[in-house]
Design a protein with these regions (language model features):
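Active-site acidic/histidine proton-transfer and metal-coordination neighborhood
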Residues: 58, 73-182, 191
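Active-site beta-loop-alpha junctions enriched in small/polar residues
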Residues: 6-12, 39-43, 68-72, 101-103, ...
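Gly/Pro-rich active-site loop or hairpin
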Residues: 11-21, 75, 163-167, 171, ...
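Short, surface-exposed basic-aromatic patches at helix termini and helix-loop junctions that form
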Residues: 53-54, 174-175, 201
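Conserved beta-strand positions in the central sheet of alpha/beta enzyme cores
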Residues: 37, 65, 97, 153, ...
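N-terminal pre-domain/capping segments
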Residues: 1-95, 124-132, 181
């Protein structure tokens, strides 16, 4: 098992301790952490990318996953989701986490009312245009990622507006997009009041990555 930490948390540690980035990264490595969870937007500038990668390499740390917020809800042909994958492949990172888009308040209400029931969830997902756009975009992304030896994942996202926030919805996406995997976030089911053990029972065969989080 390999352990990683979010780069944003490293930046926060620098801010709180007033220590330079290099010293915090050295502490991270000495603590048994080998990987960094990276926001794609932090790497979108060539100068920022080079600076971050140089610091990580010096500390003997690698990027374990790159996550990116996309807009497949409105544009299944969006380029950004492919750019996230390309960035991962470029840096030897084997997985990405895509946050593919969000519902309107009205659609989120209907989604929430059906999410506890599998058959109702299936009916909603099949009829909702946002979901259909996301599904098409994810199929395209997974096909592109396969060529790059990168795994595409979704997580149980912590928002009632997210089509990926409920167990049944995640199961539906996994079944409809062959090759798609799950990043288990241990804290985000607090938003849907669903049991993480129930989620694991349903989705464990799709698990590729874990975010450990205590929201108790």
């Amino acid at each position: 098992m390999k352990i990683s930490v979010f780069y944003e948390h490293i930046e926060k540690a620098c801010e709180q301790t007033k220590k330079p980035l290099e010293e915090v990264l050295e502490h991270v490595k000495k603590s048994g952490i080998d990987g960094i969870e990276m926001d794609y937007d932090m790497l979108s500038s060539e100068d920022d990318e080079q600076s971050i990668l140089t610091s990580l390499k010096k500390a003997r740390l690698v990027i374990s996953s790159i996550y990116g917020f996309c807009h497949l809800d409105s544009d299944p042909e969006e380029q950004k989701c492919l750019d996230v994958i390309d960035q991962a492949a470029k840096n030897g990172c084997s997985r990405v986490l895509l946050v593919p888009g969000f519902f309107s308040e009205a659609d989120a209400k209907i989604f929430g009312e059906s999410a506890d029931d599998w058959e109702k969830t299936v009916a909603f997902m099949q009829s909702n245009q946002v979901v259909q756009n996301i599904m098409a975009g994810l199929r395209r992304a997974v096909a592109h990622a396969k060529e790059k030896n990168v795994i595409v994942t979704l997580e149980d996202f912590d928002s009632t507006l997210s089509p990926c926030s409920r167990i049944n919805a995640l199961k539906w996406f996994m079944e409809q997009v062959p090759g798609l995997c799950w990043t288990l976030d241990a804290g985000n089911f607090a938003y849907s009041s669903e049991n993480i053990l129930d989620a694991y029972e349903v989705l464990r065969t799709y698990t590729a990555h874990v975010h450990c989080k205590d929201r108790g």
